[in-house]
């Protein structure tokens, strides 16, 4: 291999390794703007089934654990319409990140478990308090502090689909998965097109 090709290849491999093994604790400023999210929502709404399948194929390649967390809901008794809502949420989140020009490090199962434990701990903490415990729990999440636009979209999508009643046992799973998607995205290490780490 020519020396001129070895250097870019090595740099690309090093960047991929750094992203794969990184976790984000950078600035808490939203990295996805309202404009990025609006463009993603519009794009997803105009897609047909085949186009959504192609996006899911890209998600499977780049973020297999996020996709599998949605698809695994069937084994927990979650209905196909609820899983469809979760898939649409994941597609919009993915497109919004893409619109922002960022590339996320692969979210591992350990990352997902860590964020899920944080969120469920916040839910347990607010259970005995007056008012809407779900809203109070959400305010404790990293996503609420870092990716407010994405989180607001997710909560609204769940609400519009009728999936925000935590007393309904099967509604709990979609709520947990959807909030966890945003929490994992909010904490994932990312790079911008210029290669700088965010």
Which ranges hold each PLM region?
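Long compositionally biased, domain-poor regions of proteins
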Residues: 20-198
């Amino acid at each position: 291999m020519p020396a001129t090709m070895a250097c870019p290849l090595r740099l690309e491999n090093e960047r991929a390794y750094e992203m794969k093994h990184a976790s984000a604790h950078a600035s808490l400023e939203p990295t996805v703007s309202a404009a990025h999210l609006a463009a993603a929502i519009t794009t997803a709404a105009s897609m047909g089934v085949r186009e959504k399948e192609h996006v899911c194929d890209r998600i499977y390649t780049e973020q297999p654990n996020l996709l599998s967390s949605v698809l695994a809901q069937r084994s927990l008794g979650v209905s196909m319409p609820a899983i469809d809502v979760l898939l649409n949420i994941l597609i919009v989140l993915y497109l919004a990140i893409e619109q922002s020009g960022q590339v996320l490090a692969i979210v591992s199962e350990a990352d997902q478990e860590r964020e899920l434990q944080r969120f469920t701990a916040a839910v347990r903490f607010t259970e005995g308090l007056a008012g809407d415990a779900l809203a109070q729990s959400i305010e404790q999440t990293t996503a609420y502090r870092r990716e407010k636009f994405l989180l607001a979209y997710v909560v609204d999508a769940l609400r519009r689909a009728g999936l925000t009643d935590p007393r309904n046992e099967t509604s709990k799973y979609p709520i947990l998965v959807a909030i966890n998607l945003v929490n994992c995205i909010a904490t994932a290490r990312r790079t911008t097109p210029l290669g700088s780490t965010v």
